[in-house]
Amino acid sequence: LVLTQHKYSAILLLVSTFGGLVLNGVLKLGFNRPRPAIFLPEVHTVSSSFPSGHAMNAAIVYGTVAYLAARLHKRLWARALVMTAALIVIVLICVSRLYLGVHYPSDVIAGVAIGLAWAGFCMATLEAIQKFGARRDPKILEQEKPAPGGPPV
């Protein structure tokens, strides 16, 4: 992203991803919920169960990447395709956490909800900075301008 002059997009991806990792660690320490008693013997875990880090990080990373990719597409079908692909990956990761028995369903649901909330906050912050920022570089803003019709809903 930096090499293609999408500086703000690169910053958004970094802040949302690493901020999400920190947020997940703080929440795991705060709740310290034990994992389910029954899970596959070859699965080794070292952290607490709530919230699911995999689900949370999947929602953050794939949600943010889908948002950034959809901003660049002009056609509605392309935006829908990007969002659908991200949703499928997130759901598959969530199902894998339940299949392996390393999380309760509430851990996974909370992980996705918190991840989407954090990613949404980061995306809204990017939009506000680009719209109202005092130090705006016109060249960068033009390159990162959303496709006509605004960001996907």
Please tell me what each predicted stretch does.
Residues 1-48, 64-71, 82-84:
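Hydrophobic alpha-helical bundle signature of multipass membrane enzymes
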Residues 37-153:
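Membrane-embedded catalytic cores of phosphoryl/pyrophosphoryl-handling enzymes
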